């Protein structure tokens, strides 16, 4: 157990003991963490992350909780929250600096207001800049790494600035999973007033499409599974279509349900547990494997599960 007195020598932010993580999850699911830390700023975050590394104590970093499922039993590691504190944005010409806790949608609008295009393709994609970078978020044929100039991380207790060509990015993953992303600089495209209006209209259309096809009115964490890779020259298949073909839309387990709007979403109907969600995940994986011979891979991250959970 970390000594609070030792922690206070390096950390200026908020400290909560035995705090619920459900409020920090887009699923509104999760048990308690032994200790939850909210840094005051980026320097505070760097200090506390280095502190845990030097003490060889495990820790978990959370952004907006939009791509995670947290165990009902909570976590014994310290949890560091970046949302609400690392939210600085600086726009200089076509270069956009954003800290990890910045909401991706707010950044998209802010960039368009400065007549910079590129982020409108991610309209409606939930989460923070940091989370989007770690998982190489994508939508409508585009990925966030198309726009990256550099990424600032804490790696093995040291602060590093990594250029785009120093990072391995693939479909919905990067080699940054063991690092803590603190900030990034994006290189966007200057656009004319006419193009700006077109981009805002494109953003409106994409948001409307999401409202019509995704269960945005209920707590969820976005796509549960990655879309499987192309097979035998076929185009990429969609996980949601495979799950729907297995007749699983609307199937419930406890307080969780495979969405009747989009089968690659699981929603919290009000009293869902992580165990409920896991049961639906395993059901979908099993049914798709038996019918199509395809192993679905999780897009979300599982936090706090001590027993082996197949990913």
Curated annotation (Swiss-Prot):
Active site: 172, 223, 299
Superkingdom: Bacteria
Keyword Cell wall biogenesis/degradation (UniProt): yes
Disulfide-linked positions: none
Localization (cell): Cytoplasm
Gene Ontology CC annotations of this record: cytosol
Domain FAD-binding PCMH-type: 29-191
EC category name: oxidoreductase
GO biological process, alphabetically ordered: cell division; cell wall organization; peptidoglycan biosynthetic process; regulation of cell shape
Membrane-spanning parts: none
Known function: Cell wall formation.
Similarity comment text for this entry: Belongs to the MurB family.
Protein name, UniProt field: UDP-N-acetylenolpyruvoylglucosamine reductase
Highest classification ranks of the organism: Bacteria, Pseudomonadati, Chlorobiota, Chlorobiia, Chlorobiales
Gene name of this polypeptide: murB
